Swiss-Prot record:
Family to which the UniProt record says this protein belongs: Belongs to the UPF0102 family.
UniProt xrefs under SUPFAM superfamilies: Restriction endonuclease-like
Name of the featured protein: UPF0102 protein Mext_0406
Pfam family, one: UPF0102
Domain of life: Bacteria
PANTHER family, A to Z: UPF0102 PROTEIN YRAN (PTHR34039:SF1)
Gene Ontology molecular function, alphabetical: nucleic acid binding
Amino acid sequence: MRPPADPGARRRATHGRGLSAEGLALLVLMLKGYRPLARRFAAAGGEIDLIVRRGRTIAFVEVKARATLDAAATAIDARKRARVSRAARAWLARHPLAAGATLRADAVFVAPRRWPRHLPNAFEIEGL
């Protein structure tokens, strides 16, 4: 299938695939016992796709959808890690009751016709 010629249409299609991947990632995490706290949290020049909790652990989750799971796994670069870290710090500032929780940055990699791969502690949250 050819991508749409209109850049706006391409952007909307990519956005739609991202939302679908985030929904699938959330379903997988819920099956593992996590409960959602926030979706698409944006603040302080950063964004977090999912924020979930299981017990005393809060995970800030980056979801990456690519053609293969390996391609998705390599898609979280230093710039993206910094943006997630900034947003995580902003979320924590707004939710002081989370102060005693174990915090981590997870990733979920999504590819067509594959079960999503959840990677706990995918990277360090800078500044915590």
